[in-house]
Design a protein with these regions (language model features):
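Beta/alpha (TIM)-barrel catalytic core signal, keyed to glycine-rich beta->alpha loops juxtaposed to Asp/Glu
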Residues: 2-159
Length: 159
């Protein structure tokens, strides 16, 4: 999912005014480009960016690194979706090796991807919450990370 196009100056100026009045503490952006982030930062402080990103959809790889360098949080939306059957088989193999679920491995990969990534996975029950929390305890070996990185490699090299 590509970021929205166009200027965000007008709506973001309104949000910045609410922040100035003390009605909003922090402001973040969702589904934005680097240019839109720069536009918003010229208006007020930004604490996070939330864009479409997961193991299979990796267009923001460089953006995440830039944000980490600048101390800004990155919240991937749709962190568990969009895997093809071939990608899922690679994820299944990693999960079997770790005695975990494929989704736990996908979340663990995100957590190990960069220190500025904050996850908010959908959780529909206490059992699901426990499953998601276990992802934080998984440690993916470097060779497994390298293999999982290949899942999104084709998309990153596409024109």
């Amino acid at each position: 999912m590509a970021p929205s196009e166009g200027s965000i100056e007008e709506p973001f100026t309104v949000l910045a005014e609410l922040k100035r009045q003390g009605l909003v503490r922090h402001l973040g952006l969702s589904n934005v480009s680097r240019e839109q982030l720069a536009e918003a930062q010229a208006i007020t402080e930004i604490v996070c960016v939330q864009n479409f990103y997961n193991l299979a959809h990796r267009h923001d790889d460089g953006f995440i690194d830039e944000l980490a360098h600048r101390g800004l949080a990155y919240v991937p939306f749709f962190p568990l979706g969009g895997f093809t059957p071939l990608q899922s088989s690679a994820l299944d193999a990693a999960a079997a090796a770790l005695e975990a679920t494929p989704m736990q491995v996908a979340l663990a990969w995100l957590l190990q991807r960069s220190p500025n990534i904050l996850l908010i996975p959908g959780t529909s029950s206490v059992g699901h919450l426990r499953e998601n929390l276990r992802a934080a305890t998984l440690r993916l070996p470097a060779e497994m990370i390298a293999g999982l990185d290949l899942i999104g490699a084709r998309e990153r090299t596409a024109p």
